[in-house]
């Protein structure tokens, strides 16, 4: 075995970026097939490959960090920069949706009846389910912070309790959002209002599901004693992502649900 004269982790060749890219292609192509031809086989295949890719890629990262000790302080620092850049790109992603919403709502066209919400659209009451969803997500932000501080203090029981509670709140949010979609009086095809509403809130809902999955992985790792009070970047990244999801929801609630109604 050769001596390593630097603190960085040189990864071995991995198939997971290729399978992940293949899954992304199948999912986007499958979405088109689902929308236009009512066929969901391709998107389901893409989701299956993506799930298998995530499972095995996470397994490899856990193996490299927890059991082989490759995640040195320098590597962890680079992972932090990577997560910050990723969240920045996500902020810009949602900026596009807010831009589309405000572009359409601040100067509604004649086709919309020169009013916002457009003629024939009955918006959702912002003080019913959306307000409950806001309270649920804000509460989950408190519980994930509780879990983080408990982990840093070495309080394992409270870390597990708080993390479990956060996952339950995230799942509850997803259920409420799904119920809201089924009960809405308009669809994604109902003018620019329906398009901006369902695309913006739908992508946020997808991010909540991704964040919940992230937290479930962290819970499983915590149960297996993978995290210590000083070495837990996987959990830290999940907490950052969850706070990002919280903040985006506040902007969505104030813009689309409250002001936009």
Swiss-Prot record:
Enzyme Commission number, as recorded: 7.1.1.9
Subcellular location: Mitochondrion inner membrane
UniProt-listed GO biological process terms: mitochondrial electron transport, cytochrome c to oxygen
Catalytic activity entry: 4 Fe(II)-[cytochrome c] + O2 + 8 H(+)(in) = 4 Fe(III)-[cytochrome c] + 2 H2O + 4 H(+)(out)
InterPro entries reported in the protein's UniProt record: Cyt_c/ubiquinol_Oxase_su3, Cyt_c_oxase_su3_dom, Cyt_c_oxidase-like_su3, Cyt_c_oxidase_su3-like_sf, Cyt_c_oxidase_su3_a-hlx
Enzyme class: translocase
Described purpose of this protein according to its UniProt entry: Component of the cytochrome c oxidase, the last enzyme in the mitochondrial electron transport chain which drives oxidative phosphorylation. The respiratory chain contains 3 multisubunit complexes succinate dehydrogenase (complex II, CII), ubiquinol-cytochrome c oxidoreductase (cytochrome b-c1 complex, complex III, CIII) and cytochrome c oxidase (complex IV, CIV), that cooperate to transfer electrons derived from NADH and succinate to molecular oxygen, creating an electrochemical gradient over the inner membrane that drives transmembrane transport and the ATP synthase.
Descriptive protein name: Cytochrome c oxidase subunit 3
Lineage, uppermost ranks: Eukaryota, Metazoa, Chordata, Craniata, Vertebrata
């Amino acid at each position: 075995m050769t001596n390593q004269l630097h603190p960085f982790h040189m990864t071995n060749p991995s198939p997971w970026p290729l399978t992940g890219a293949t899954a992304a292609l199948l999912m986007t192509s499958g979405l088109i097939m689902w929308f236009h031809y009512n066929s969901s086989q391709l998107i389901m295949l893409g989701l299956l490959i993506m799930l298998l890719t995530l499972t095995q890629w996470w397994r490899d990262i856990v193996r490299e960090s927890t059991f082989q000790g490759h995640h040195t302080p320098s590597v962890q620092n680079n992972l932090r920069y990577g997560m910050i850049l990723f969240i920045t790109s996500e902020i810009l992603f949602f900026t596009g949706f807010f831009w589309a919403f405000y572009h359409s709502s601040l100067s509604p066209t004649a086709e919309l009846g020169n009013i916002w919400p457009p003629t024939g659209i009955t918006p959702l009451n912002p003080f019913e389910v959306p307000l409950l969803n806001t309270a649920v997500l804000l509460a989950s932000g408190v519980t994930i912070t509780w879990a983080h501080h408990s982990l840093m203090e070495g309080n394992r029981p409270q870390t597990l309790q708080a993390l479990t509670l956060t996952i339950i709140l995230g799942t509850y949010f997803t259920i409420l959002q799904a119920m809201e979609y089924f009960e809405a009086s308009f669809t994604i095809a109902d003018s620019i209002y329906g398009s901006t509403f369902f695309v913006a809130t739908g992508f946020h809902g997808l991010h909540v599901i991704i964040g919940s999955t992230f937290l479930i992985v962290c819970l499983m790792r915590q149960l297996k004693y993978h995290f210590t009070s000083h070495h837990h970047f996987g959990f830290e990244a999940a907490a950052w992502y969850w706070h990002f999801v919280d903040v985006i929801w506040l902007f969505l609630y104030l813009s689309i649900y409250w002001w936009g109604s």
